[in-house]
A protein has these predicted regions:
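Acidic, glycine- and histidine-enriched catalytic cores of nucleic acid- and nucleotide-handling enzymes
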Residues: 1-64, 70
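Arginine residue identity/basic-tract feature
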Residues: 30, 38, 45-51, 65, ...
Length: 170
């Protein structure tokens, strides 16, 4: 979308070449142009698509959803710190359980948490305080310690946050 100012400089007209306004009204996340191309240009967009969907309560367009699934392997080229930041935002969103479900359904969870999540605490995410360490610990509750520690190392978190997650998850 772009805005074109009128000659008087007071008003403007929105020029929507890609249907962005309709997508906003319909609450749909969609890539501009070919989704595979957009997600290959910057693989972090894969996680951002999930984050925006859960933060805004939007659906993901089927073609974009398919591309998110197909392009997840590109996350191997993204720094663990950047992946961790997106994961923190997903878990601290208004719909953390939906975020975890999307990450799992799209095959993205192994790129975020290499050892996966615990089968025990996932359903309780929406009842927990909006605190990353608490929600992350819930995802890893009662995991084998070696898996828990590998997940934590992979997230590249500050020591105090890592320690809190490990303590809570045991």
């Amino acid at each position: 979308m772009a805005a074109e100012l009128s000659e008087d400089g007071e008003t403007f007209e929105i020029i929507d070449l890609f249907g962005g306004q309709a997508d906003l009204q319909n609450k749909v996340i969609r890539c501009v142009g070919d989704p595979h191309t957009r997600l290959t240009e910057d693989a972090l967009r894969v996680l951002r698509g999930v984050r925006f969907a859960v933060k805004l309560g939007f659906d993901i367009h089927p073609a974009t959803r398919a591309a998110l699934k197909d392009c997840g392997h590109g996350l191997k080229r993204i720094s663990r710190e950047r992946i961790s930041v997106e994961f923190q935002k997903i878990l601290c969103s208004p719909a953390p359980l939906r975020g975890v479900s999307l990450l799992t359904d799209l095959g993205l969870m192994p790129h975020v948490l290499p050892c996966g999540t615990s089968p025990y605490g996932t359903g309780d995410l929406h009842h927990l305080p909006n605190d990353f360490a608490v929600r992350c610990a819930c995802l890893m509750w009662q995991m084998p310690e070696c898996d828990l520690l590998e997940n934590i190392r992979g997230l590249k978190l500050p020591g105090v946050v890592s320690h809190a997650i490990v303590t809570l998850a045991k």
